[in-house]
Amino acid sequence: MASNEDEAISMQESMTDEEIKELFYAQEASILLEAFSEARPKRSGMTRVFPDGKVILEGGIEESFINSNLTRVPIIMGTNKDENKFFNSLNRNFVKWGPATGMYKTVGIDEMPIEILDLDYYEAVNFYGSSFWKQRAVDTTSSKLVVSGHNKNFAYRFDWDELSTINGLDMSKLIGAAHAMEILFVFGSFDSYIVKNFLFGEGAYPAGKKLSDQIQSYWAEFAYNGSPGKGREGNLPEWKAWSSGQNDKYLVLDSDNDQGVYMSNLEYTQDYLLDLSLIHI
């Protein structure tokens, strides 16, 4: 076999499709998994799938949004309002970190965030980063799916951000409705002492628990019937499928302490977000 990448490329180009197929089929699963785990992207980030035209469409994931010949099934897709905050909270250009104190130091935590250096700048960076992610991952995708004839795409934006103050820093501003925060609500994982006593801000638990129950009800109804509707008991605001024009598009998931649960017709497009940025300059 090849001893380096150049030799491997040369060998691959000299082989027929059938020979490549036979080579892969002859390998043990462990060999294939080892090769995948050792693969590294040429730049940064994770190793990406590639559109081979067999497993993945030649047009990549984009083609799956617009190809009306594909089988369509109901989908739930969504993002979090403050998606980027978790990652940016680790960036020392935005947040000052310092020695942990008190019980946090006792349990072995050495450093903790202690100050957002420029709150307005931090909020702006996170708003646009999170909003453009929503635009790419949900809104543009959903619009393309509707055009291709897919009418059972249920979108959401998770907005809950009623977090506690830790080490003197308001977590609702530092983290907010950040990456993966919704997972706790989908699975109702509130029994942990740490979650109950350190996640929720003052007075936030009852409304947060109610929101979790609502989310689970929507998810369960979707699993049963392919549409979240009004939840299992039929007593929640109707979660409608994404639609075009000025109609309702996605469900905002927040607690009664703030906005509550409601449908929104505000679509995040590149033009909309760029216009906002010009207003703020």
Where does each model-flagged region fall?
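Short, charged, surface-exposed loops that flank catalytic or proteolytic processing sites
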Residues: 2-22
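Substrate-gating cap/lid region and adjacent catalytic-acid/histidine neighborhood
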Residues: 17-206
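Mature extracytoplasmic/periplasmic domains
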Residues: 163, 225, 229-264
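Non-catalytic, well-ordered alpha-helical segments in soluble enzyme domains
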Residues: 207-230
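C-terminal beta-signal and terminal closure region of outer-membrane beta-barrel proteins
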Residues: 265-271
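Conserved small/polar residues in nucleotide/adenosyl-binding loops
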Residues: 279-281
